[in-house]
Amino acid sequence: MLTVTVAQDGSGDFASIAEAVLAVPYEEEALVQVGPGIYREKLVCEKRCITLRGVGADKTKLVWGDGGKLPHKDGRPTHTFRSYTAFFSGETLCVEDMTIENDAGPGAKAGQAVAAYVDSTRAVFRRVKLLGSQDTLFCAPLPEKEREKDGFLGPRSLAPRKPTAQYYTDCEIAGDIDFIFGGGDALFENCVIRTVDNRIPHSYVTAPSGKADGLGFVFWNCDFVSDCPAGSVYLGRPWRPEGKTAVLDCRLGAHIAPEGFIAWNDRTDTGLASFAEADSTGPGAAERPAWVKQLSGPEAAELLAHARTLCRPKIN
C-alpha cells in the first residue's frame, strides 16, 4: 500500500490534502495520513481504493464554503451538486478521524451546501464529523430525472446512476434541511444526528430518493439531538416517491415531531415511500401515522442484518 503524509508545517510529503490525493495513481491502494490543522480546500477524490485518515475530528478539519445560491466561476449559480467541500468517487473509500465541513451558512443565505458528496461504490466513515446546514451529506446516486433546470448540475449529472453502499459508524452529522439525502444505501450505527437550529419553522433529517428494491437509509443505536423547538423536526420526507428511511433502537429528542415523517412539500404521495421505526425511546418517540410502519422485533432484526451485510466493510 502506498502511504503519503500531509502536514501544514511542511514535515509531510504534502502540505494540502488535494495535492496528496492528486499524487496517488488511480489503481494503487493508498493511505493518506493527514495531520492536525484546518485545511481550507475543495477536495475531489476519485481513486480506486483510498483511505483518508486524520488525527481526530476536532484536530483535522477539511473546510470549504460553497453554496448553491452563490455564484460559480462559470457565471451561473453553483447549485447543490457543485457546492461540495469533498467529492468522493471510485471503488472503495474509507475516511477516518476528521471533520468535513461546509461553512457557507444557512440555506436562506447560501442555499444548499454539501459537505460530503459520496459517490464511491463502497464507502466507510469512522469517527468523522460531517457539518453543514442544508444538504450536508449526499449519498449518491442522483435520481433519474431532475425537477428543475440545472438541478443536478455537477460531477455526475450525465453519468449512469450506479448503486452505492455506505457505512457510517461513531460519526456526527449535523444540518437543518434534508441534511442526509440521496439514493444510496446507507447504514448509520452509533452516530449522533444533530439538527442545527437556524430559526426556520421546520427541519428535516433525511430525504431519501432510492428505489423500492433498495435498502435506503437505516439508523441503528443513534442519538437524534437538537436545540430546535419541540416538535419542529421531522425524521424524513421522500425526495422521490419510493424513498426509504428506517430508525431502529434510536433515542429521539423532544425536537422530533410527533408524526415522525412527512410528505415532500405540498405533495401527498406517501403511499410509495417506506418509513419505518422500531423501539424508539426519548421524548421524540410517539405514536406515528398509519403510513409509518412500526416494525416487530424480528422484522427490525432482519432489516438490520440485511443492512449490515450490504453496507458494512468486508474487511475492517
Residue ranges and their predicted role:
Residues 2-316:
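Sequence-level preference for short, compositionally simple segments enriched
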